[in-house]
Amino acid sequence: MIKVKKKFGQNFLQDENIKNQIIQAIPNDVKRIVEIGPGLGDLTQKLVKLDSMIDCFEIDSELYTILLDKFRSELDSGKLNIINSDALNAWDKLSASEYFLVANLPYYVATNMILKAIDDKNCKGLVVMIQREVAIKFSSEAGDKEFSSLAILTWLKGKCELLFDVPSSAFNPPPKVISSVIRIIKDRDLSLNLKYDNFKNFLRVAFSAPRKTLLKNLSNLVQRDRLEIFFNTENLSHTIRPHELSVALYLKLFKEAENERRKQNPCG
């Protein structure tokens, strides 16, 4: 009997229907799949039946030993590779060639892991299970109360879909929250057209206080009178909240702010 290690956020998926739905969500033309946190290898058993090469990253040494024994034939044939490491610490190896990410991500690392994959040019997309609250933030659209910087950063690289919810009863042990599976297909990179790190900081400030007006939040970064000119030109209410502005207008406003910054600091 495996003892669950809370420090790794372990909840093992046991529902066969959910596993099959995850497999069906993976595009057919994927040559290499990276699975993070295979656990007992229940989903891995289905992944190795696909035409793709599979690389698994398992942080738990005890589970790693079990996986080596369980998938001995697949390892010998070269179909499967299992690495005993924290995926975040082995990202260079993980990202050595193009891949599609599949994972039941621990809640405590989910957001950072997804953002890292989104920014990785070798990652062509992902199907991951995460806490529903986080899934909504990634998949929401402008106007939704949950619309966030995560959705905007994702939109720059591709399309995010919330595919389905997963009840806690599908896991052992059952988590205290509802999970959801999202799929991101990366088919563009609009971050190349802007100073990406500056844009991330711009969004961080814009969404720093979701209940306050966007105008007030951004006044900490951009001169208020310049913001008011932009809002008036675009016929925007001065009382709109961060979640109410479209991605296109966020990009336009950021570029205006960058132009203003360069005028104020030509050498910066």
From Swiss-Prot:
- Entry's Gene Ontology molecular function annotations: 16S rRNA (adenine(1518)-N(6)/adenine(1519)-N(6))-dimethyltransferase activity; RNA binding
Q: Which PROSITE patterns match?
A: RRNA_A_DIMETH, SAM_RNA_A_N6_MT
Give compartment(s).
Cytoplasm
Q: What class of enzyme is it?
A: transferase
Reactions catalysed, as given in the entry: adenosine(1518)/adenosine(1519) in 16S rRNA + 4 S-adenosyl-L-methionine = N(6)-dimethyladenosine(1518)/N(6)-dimethyladenosine(1519) in 16S rRNA + 4 S-adenosyl-L-homocysteine + 4 H(+)
Give the highest taxon in the source lineage: Bacteria
Q: For this protein, what is the EC number? A: 2.1.1.182
Q: Could you list this entry's UniProt keywords, alphabetically sorted.
A: Cytoplasm, Methyltransferase, RNA-binding, rRNA processing, S-adenosyl-L-methionine, Transferase
What role does it play?
Specifically dimethylates two adjacent adenosines (A1518 and A1519) in the loop of a conserved hairpin near the 3'-end of 16S rRNA in the 30S particle. May play a critical role in biogenesis of 30S subunits.
The family database entries (HAMAP family) matched by this protein are listed as: 16SrRNA_methyltr_A (MF_00607)
Name under which the protein is recorded: Ribosomal RNA small subunit methyltransferase A
The species is Campylobacter fetus subsp. fetus (strain 82-40)
Q: What is the lineage of its organism?
A: Bacteria, Pseudomonadati, Campylobacterota, Epsilonproteobacteria, Campylobacterales
Q: Coding gene?
A: rsmA
